[in-house]
Amino acid sequence: MKVCIIGASGFVGGELLRILLQHSGVEVVCATSRRFKGEYVYRVHPNLRGFTQLKFVEPSIDAALKADVVFLALPHGESVKWVPKLYESGVAVFDLSADFRLKDPNAYVEWYKWPQPHPYPDLLQKAVYGQPELHRSELVGAKLVAVPGCMATASILMLAPLAKHGLLGETPPVIDAKIGSSGAGAEGSVVDLHSFRTYVVRPYEPVHHRHIAEIEQELSLLAGKRVKVAFTPHAVDMVRGIFATGHVFVEKMPTEADMWKMYRSMYGDSKFIRIVKDRLGISRYPNVKYVLGSNFVDIGFELDQRLNRLVTFSAIDNLVRGAAGQAVQAFNVAMGFPEDEGLRYIPLAPV
């Protein structure tokens, strides 16, 4: 199956290349970049030296149409210019931007500051939210997939079993997320320079972060009612990784056995979700160190009987499970490949 990556010079584009170059069912036929047009891919992504002789080409519809599948690793607001033409042509599209994640066209005005509602509401409804654990049946054969956001992924998956079992009540769950510097992309702002980022722990967009929209959308679907969340992310001194902590206040506390049953019933057959709650060993709860470079989501929980509070944890690699890895996982499900094809990475340790 021939694949083209539009926007292949950034961190996410590089991860797509790393994964797809080792996928047994894929031939990467084009990787685009305006800035690096004509340059060897490995000169921008040195870790790929020896694995490919591809050169970057100018992004164009014509280049994309040489492939069966197109991965769009473009900034928010850019994919919407590409998707209609690609979709009409019959090419399968996996969009890693936010441009087709939200079902409500008006949500793009509120959360992404678009000047008007989404111009393609029909395509919004056709797009499948690309989280295989929650939308597996819809993904099979899908031609337009909206790959979830990184912090949304960590947040949704740790709270999904609680939403499904009616434990998200009137009090909004509180989500505290930490993310590494690669989340800012390959061309971040001045505060992402080493001298500013080293040793940092700082909040950003502490209220009304745009990932709230998809977190609430997905949890509401599972709960069968409107769910709101309080979400605050923090930039921290690491390159890769997201760690999220969720606080859910309930009227009636489940037992620990109930919690295990809820999480196992939803994720027991998942190839990429590991429940980490151990009384022994050096990692008794999820830890970003033990998912780096992989597509795993490590999820844990604890019960606070004093406050009727459920504490949930999740750890992911933001570039893999939070972006490129999840895109390939969704691609595998959509196209009939083994779900873990190209994604069989044991996380590095120590790092």
UniProtKB/Swiss-Prot annotation:
GO terms for cellular component: cytoplasm. It is found in: Cytoplasm. Pathway: Amino-acid biosynthesis; L-lysine biosynthesis via AAA pathway; L-lysine from L-alpha-aminoadipate (Thermus route): step 3/5; Amino-acid biosynthesis; L-arginine biosynthesis. InterPro entries: AGPR_type-1, LysY, NAD(P)-bd_dom_sf, NAGSA_dehydrogenase, Semialdehyde_DH_NAD-bd. The active site is at C150. One of its GO terms (molecular function) is NADP+ binding. Its main location: cytoplasm. Its EC number is 1.2.1.103, 1.2.1.106. It catalyses: [amino-group carrier protein]-C-terminal-N-(1-carboxy-5-oxopentan-1-yl)-L-glutamine + phosphate + NADP(+) = [amino-group carrier protein]-C-terminal-N-(1-carboxy-5-phosphooxy-5-oxopentan-1-yl)-L-glutamine + NADPH + H(+); [amino-group carrier protein]-C-terminal-gamma-(L-glutamyl-5-semialdehyde)-L-glutamate + phosphate + NADP(+) = [amino-group carrier protein]-C-terminal-gamma-(5-phospho-L-glutamyl)-L-glutamate + NADPH + H(+). The keyword Cytoplasm applies. GO terms for biological process: arginine biosynthetic process via ornithine; L-arginine biosynthetic process; lysine biosynthetic process via aminoadipic acid. Keywords: Amino-acid biosynthesis, Arginine biosynthesis, Cytoplasm, Lysine biosynthesis, NADP, Oxidoreductase. The keyword Cytoplasm applies. Pfam families: Semialdhyde_dh, Semialdhyde_dhC_1. NADP(+) binds at S9, G10, F11, V12, S33, R34, R35, N318. NCBIfam families: argC. Belongs to the NAGSA dehydrogenase family. Type 1 subfamily. LysY sub-subfamily. Involved in both the arginine and lysine biosynthetic pathways. This is Putative [LysW]-L-2-aminoadipate/[LysW]-L-glutamate phosphate reductase. The lineage of its organism: Archaea, Thermoproteota, Thermoprotei, Thermoproteales, Thermoproteaceae.
